[in-house]
Every structure is written in C-alpha cells, then in structure tokens.
C-alpha cells in the first residue's frame, strides 16, 4: 500500500476541504480518467483496491496511472481511553481529494474496456465520480 517513506512531522491537523481542485484536474498521461465530484479523504487501502480492480479487468493490455498519493496521516486513539494525554498514534494514510481531481488515468486500451475498468474502480471509491475521455 502507498505511504510516504519519511515525513517531516508524524502527526497533522485534520484541515478542511474548501473549494475545488485546481491542480491535478486534467488528463496528463492516458486517454481515459476517473474524476472525483465530491470532497473526501481516500485511504491508501481504497486507492490500492481501485488500482487492483482496474489492473485485473484490463489484464495485460493498457497502462494505469494513479494520480493521487496518501500523504496525510490519520491518528486514532485506542478505544475506551480517557480524554487527555495527547493525540492518538498514526493509524493509516489518506489522500485529500477535492472535486475535480483526477484519481486514475488509463491508456492503451479501447474505450469500452477503459469505461468498464474505471467504473469498477469507481465502485470502490467512497464518492461520486465520473468517466472522462481526452478530447483531441
């Protein structure tokens, strides 16, 4: 699963997801893409599940690009612990996704194959998303 090799700080604030994505919102590598329509945190597990689903469906053909990376640690406190005594320990990693962000790109396959593969990956995501085709 994806996670940073090293970070400057172990823990981060939660932050907030205002507005829409102005970076990473156009197709750069492949011909087809999956674009997020809602703001959310997508975990490293969800990213990997989507990638695997696309790879399995496409078989040998095509290439897949994952355009998001989980670089934000999410901390969780142990259950049934009293309040206080600091922030919990980092449990998993998430990618902060705003509307308009491209999640996956695909190339080297026909549009029908790409459409089905990307729809399978979309079903693994916790948000509404849409299929995009590169207009030439």
Swiss-Prot record:
Belongs to the universal ribosomal protein uL16 family. GO terms for cellular component: chloroplast; mitochondrial large ribosomal subunit; plastid. Its main location: plastid. It is found in: Plastid, Chloroplast. This is Large ribosomal subunit protein uL16c. CDD domains: Ribosomal_L16_L10e. One of its GO terms (biological process) is mitochondrial translation. Keywords: Chloroplast, Plastid, Ribonucleoprotein, Ribosomal protein. Part of the 50S ribosomal subunit.
